[in-house]
């Protein structure tokens, strides 16, 4: 085969970089393109329920496998996905957004086509996406198309940000040389400037040598930019106390003897707050300093000796080194740091949160008890997805087992995100290991925004755990403002009927109201195996919330009320 269609070329390239599932919806400008998916062995079309959910799913898939792909149609389809694409941009998630657009001939004639604004401007939606994309490409030249496609895939993967790729309907059936596929897309990072890298490493080593009480703080981009292994090696090499932020959950092994807990500024436990804020050197890896990730910007470091490691720059105190990538710096630091810490004596790390005190089995479930207890159910390698709201804050109280990974949209915070992200993560998990468990915690209110995507799971026989926290509405909103306001109320749905209504025949739907029911269920060996899709409705008091969320809600309300 000397030639292949441009459409097939796209999918062959996507498959080569490890993507096996593509999310999105069909539309008349992408139908010919979608035909080509079935020509590539090992690719599947998930058949998402709407474009927003598809974007969330591509985000969740990418957080597990490094790149997600969504395909939409021009105008109406692509715009429906943009909230999810914006979230991926904000949270550094690599998503390739492929849009089927009208033919070049139609564009040249400025035809008054459906899905347009009726003004002949065919580039308007492309321009909208440019603001939330690392780069974009609108293919107009067949000869240059393969290189542009390769550039888009590489950029999305390396930068861990969304990339927009517009493919005109008339080009996807035209042929390009098949031999181009023989040269794989180079996904390796380009080397740092040697002089700048050495200056950075030596400066950090000097700070390390002088430090008496250093700590390591791992954040979201340690996971996104693939330096989790280096962070672990740095902890092992130095024995410095190590902490994570809410967005960094899963970036450090929480069973590691030097793991100290979750740092969220004033919302941290007193022991964690003291340990981090009394440090005389902070090695901060992959920080995303958003309000919900920092306890409304309440970090109170006593030292100015802060080193920030980022994917494309390093900051040491007030000096920035643009273009110096953290992965290579961490590798050199690990190799050299031993000689600089010969006199360092490891300090104790904070103990984990105490276990729940014994209570009667008939005790109604409550948030504080639930999140402290959850660690007993979790297993190595679990993927835990938590919704914006009580779940995203409560999970910070749960100690993860080794290799567990947390997904939560703490920065963008789009309600309903977790359902789509769980779908994407479940596809990815199945591709990696069919026994790998994906566990979702979502509130009854948030679930109503994206619930239909559960049908996609059933269609493919996927088997996550869906814990629906039924606390009668938008608790996080009620805590911030309007606890009795009508706009924070929802119509209660029959949660336990979802699976059967979406066509499931092999499933479990289980209500849980008491401590005893929770313990019995989560201790059941059969329940611990992901042998079927499960929806567990967890009944909780209406205004019950993790203590950290109550505190955060008060901080958020205060910020919202500020006049200057």
Swiss-Prot record:
Residues noted as binding thiamine diphosphate in the record, renumbered to the chain: 390, 413-415, 445-446, 471-476
MF annotations from Gene Ontology: magnesium ion binding; pyruvate decarboxylase activity; thiamine pyrophosphate binding
Signal peptide: none
Annotated GO CC locations: cytosol; nucleus
EC assignment: 4.1.1.1
Cited InterPro entries: DHS-like_NAD/FAD-binding_dom, PDC/IPDC-like, THDP-binding, Thiamin_PyroP_enz_cen_dom, Thiamin_PyroP_enz_TPP-bd_dom, TPP_enzyme_TPP-bd, TPP_PDC_IPDC, TPP_PYR_PDC_IPDC-like
Key words, A-Z: Decarboxylase, Lyase, Magnesium, Metal-binding, Thiamine pyrophosphate
Keyword Magnesium on entry: yes
Top-level EC class: lyase
Cofactor: Mg(2+); thiamine diphosphate
Keyword Transmembrane: no
Cofactor annotation comment: Binds 1 Mg(2+) per subunit.
Binding, Mg(2+): 444, 471, 473
Substrates-to-products reaction catalysed: a 2-oxocarboxylate + H(+) = an aldehyde + CO2; pyruvate + H(+) = acetaldehyde + CO2
Binding site for pyruvate: 28, 115, 477
UniProt record, GO biological process: aromatic amino acid family catabolic process to alcohol via Ehrlich pathway
Quaternary structure note: Homotetramer.
Family: Belongs to the TPP enzyme family.
Name of the featured protein: Pyruvate decarboxylase
Lineage summary: Eukaryota, Fungi, Dikarya, Ascomycota, Saccharomycotina
Gene this protein is translated from: PDC
């Amino acid at each position: 085969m000397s030639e292949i269609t441009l459409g097939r070329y796209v999918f062959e390239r996507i498959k080569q970089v490890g993507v096996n599932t593509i999310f999105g919806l069909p539309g008349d400008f992408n139908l010919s393109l979608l035909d080509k998916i079935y020509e590539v062995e090992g690719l599947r079309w998930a058949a998402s329920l709407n474009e927003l959910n598809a974007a969330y799913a591509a985000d969740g898939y990418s957080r597990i496998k490094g790149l997600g792909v969504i395909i939409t149609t021009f105008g109406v389809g692509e715009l429906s996905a943009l909230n999810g694409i914006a979230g991926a941009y904000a949270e550094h998630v690599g998503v390739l957004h492929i849009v089927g657009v009208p033919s070049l001939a139609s564009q040249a004639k400025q035809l008054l086509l459906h899905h347009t604004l009726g003004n002949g401007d065919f580039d308007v939606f492309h321009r909208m996406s440019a603001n939330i994309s690392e780069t974009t490409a609108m293919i107009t030249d067949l000869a240059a198309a393969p290189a542009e496609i390769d550039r888009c895939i590489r950029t999305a993967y390396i930068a861990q940000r969304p990339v927009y790729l517009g493919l005109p309907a008339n080009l996807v059936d035209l042929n390009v040389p098949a031999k181009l596929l023989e040269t794989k897309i180079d996904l390796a990072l380009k080397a740092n400037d040697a002089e700048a890298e050495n200056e950075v490493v030596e400066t950090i080593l000097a700070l390390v040598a002088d430090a008496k009480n250093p700590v390591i703080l791992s954040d979201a981009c340690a996971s996104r930019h693939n330096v989790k292994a280096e962070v672990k090696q740095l902890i092992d090499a130095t024995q410095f106390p190590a902490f994570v932020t809410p967005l960094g959950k899963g970036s450090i092994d929480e069973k590691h003897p030097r793991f100290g807990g979750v740092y969220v500024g004033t919302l941290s436990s007193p022991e964690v707050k003291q340990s981090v804020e009394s440090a005389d050197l902070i090695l901060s890896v992959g920080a995303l300093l958003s309000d919900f990730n920092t306890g409304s910007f309440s970090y109170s470091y006593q030292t100015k000796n802060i080193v920030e490691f980022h994917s494309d720059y390093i900051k040491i105190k007030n000096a920035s080194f643009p273009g110096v990538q953290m992965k290579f710096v961490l590798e050199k630091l690990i190799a050299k740091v031993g000689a600089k810490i010969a006199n360092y004596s490891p300090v104790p790390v904070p103990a984990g949160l105490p276990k729940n005190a014994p209570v009667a089995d008939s005790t109604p479930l409550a948030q504080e008890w639930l999140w402290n207890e959850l660690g007993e159910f979790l297993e190595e390698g679990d993927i835990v997805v938590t919704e914006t709201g009580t779940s995203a804050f409560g999970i910070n109280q749960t100690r993860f087992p080794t290799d567990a990974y947390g997904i939560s949209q703490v920065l963008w915070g789009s309600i309903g995100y977790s359902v789509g992200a769980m779908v994407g993560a479940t596809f990815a998990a199945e591709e990696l290991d069919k026994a790998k468990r994906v566990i979702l915690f979502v509130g009854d209110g948030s679930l109503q925004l994206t619930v239909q995507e559960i049908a996609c799971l059933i269609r493919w026989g996927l088997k996550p755990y869906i814990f629906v926290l039924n606390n009668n509405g938008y608790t996080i909103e009620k805590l911030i403002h309007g606890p009795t306001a009508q706009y924070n109320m929802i119509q209660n749905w029959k949660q336990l009927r979802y699976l059967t209504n979406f066509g499931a025949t092999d499933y479990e739907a289980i209500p849980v109201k008491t401590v005893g029911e929770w313990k019995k269920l989560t201790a059941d060996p059969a329940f611990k195996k992901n042998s079927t899709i499960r929806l567990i409705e967890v009944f909780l008091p209406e205004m019950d919330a993790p203590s950290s969320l109550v505190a955060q809600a008060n901080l958020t309300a205060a910020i919202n009320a500020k006049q200057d």
